[in-house]
Amino acid sequence: MIVAGVDEVGRGCLFGPVWAAAVILKAEAFDRLPALGVTDSKALSAKRRQALLPEIHSHCLSYGLGQASAACIDAVGIRAATELAMCRALQRLCHSPDHVLVDGSLPLRPWPGSQETVVAGDSHCLAIACASILAKEGRDALLQRLDQRWPGYGLASHKGYGTKAHRTALLQWGPTPLHRLSFLAPELKGGSPAGASSGNLE
């Protein structure tokens, strides 16, 4: 039976897409990766996550990434957008899973196949832990690039979360097209930066 683990990152951010990864591991991964310290991405430093990436890639039978944009989040809500990102990640796997392990307590409603929720799955399930690392590193790399486009917001440091520095930048500059307006308090929704263009509803 082919089992995939799926996890998301960026659900609580004020900026940018919610990102997901799905992973199907090779049999030998279950000995090798725990010995290397693979666990929940939140428990690992950025340097350690980056060091683990090639090991995770080499021990995957298949992996896929998916995202849903800030515009999509504003349109359909964070839960539906997160489900969309997860389904996109699963659909990009090279092998169709017989069963999906979903991090958290909420089922993946659009997924038509067999699935199981795993509370704190990124700490207790190796495939979900690997997915959490791939999702985190993928989204962080995107935020590093977007920091160059909007350098005044500190995106490379806070990764879109609602830190004091991020909120101060919003008060000064207003939201970019990639901010989630539905997540912002009224006082943070001022004018958009000069030259801004609308984000895609994906």
Curated annotation (Swiss-Prot):
One of its GO terms (molecular function) is RNA-DNA hybrid ribonuclease activity. It is an enzyme of class 3 (hydrolase). Coiled coil: none annotated. Manganese or magnesium. Binds 1 divalent metal ion per monomer in the absence of substrate. May bind a second metal ion after substrate binding. GO terms for cellular component: cytoplasm; ribonuclease H2 complex. Endonuclease that specifically degrades the RNA of RNA-DNA hybrids. This is Ribonuclease HII. The lineage of its organism: Bacteria, Bacillati, Cyanobacteriota, Cyanophyceae, Synechococcales. The gene is rnhB.
